[in-house]
């Protein structure tokens, strides 16, 4: 599917999600689900990547996300990571990587999804993470899972793992530094969803 069609599909899904939440859900249920839509930004720079986007759905049981991005190297491996700042009020000057050192923030990075970029340089990710689920937690990436979905600041980070290496592909698709070395892993894009 080409980039223009994916962008249109993402826009339609966004509108349908909003319509379902606004029209088809009784008021009691509407308060128990919250949806936010954010563009992706260049990691470390902050510039918006037009035509990209992420949808985050919060419930008391956990969070779900879909993400569409482009400008990737065709055939390279990418992962999407959940970054939960469970107590964003304890962050210093906005939540970010430095806040992992502050135990009051209760920050954690957890794997979300992995993809190989298409021939057109696009990738679509989707994932769900339940409250308290620490599946795939790696050393140094935090100690707690998602605690309170409606109060956490949630970032979704797209990470590059370089060209696909057949013998390491499983790790490249699911580990923070999978395939690195010999490749170089780096965070490329991020979407920030405020509580």
Predicted regions and their residues:
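N-terminal leader/targeting pre-sequences
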Residues: 28-195
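Bacterial N-terminal signal peptides
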Residues: 11-23
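Short, Lys/Arg-enriched N-terminal segments with co-localized hydrophobic residues
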Residues: 1-3, 26-29
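Bacterial N-terminal signal peptides that target proteins for export
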Residues: 2-12
């Amino acid at each position: 599917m080409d980039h223009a069609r994916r962008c249109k599909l993402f826009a339609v899904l966004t509108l349908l999600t909003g319509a379902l939440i606004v029209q088809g859900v009784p008021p009691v249920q509407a308060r128990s689900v919250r949806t936010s839509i954010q563009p992706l930004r260049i990691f470390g720079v902050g510039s918006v990547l037009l035509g990209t986007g992420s949808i985050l759905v919060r419930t008391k049981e956990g969070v779900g996300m879909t993400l569409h991005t482009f400008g990737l190297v065709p055939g390279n491996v990418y992962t999407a990571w959940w970054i939960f700042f469970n107590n964003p009020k304890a962050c210093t000057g906005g939540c970010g990587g430095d806040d992992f050192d502050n135990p009051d923030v209760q920050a954690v990075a957890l794997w979300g999804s992995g993809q190989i970029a298409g021939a057109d340089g696009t990738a679509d990710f989707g994932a769900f993470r339940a409250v308290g689920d620490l599946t795939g937690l790696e050393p140094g990436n935090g100690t707690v899972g998602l605690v309170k979905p409606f109060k956490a600041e949630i970032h979704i980070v797209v990470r590059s793992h370089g060209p696909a290496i057949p013998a390491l592909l499983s790790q490249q698709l699911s580990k923070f530094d999978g395939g690195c070395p010999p490749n170089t892993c780096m965070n490329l894009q991020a979407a920030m969803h405020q509580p």
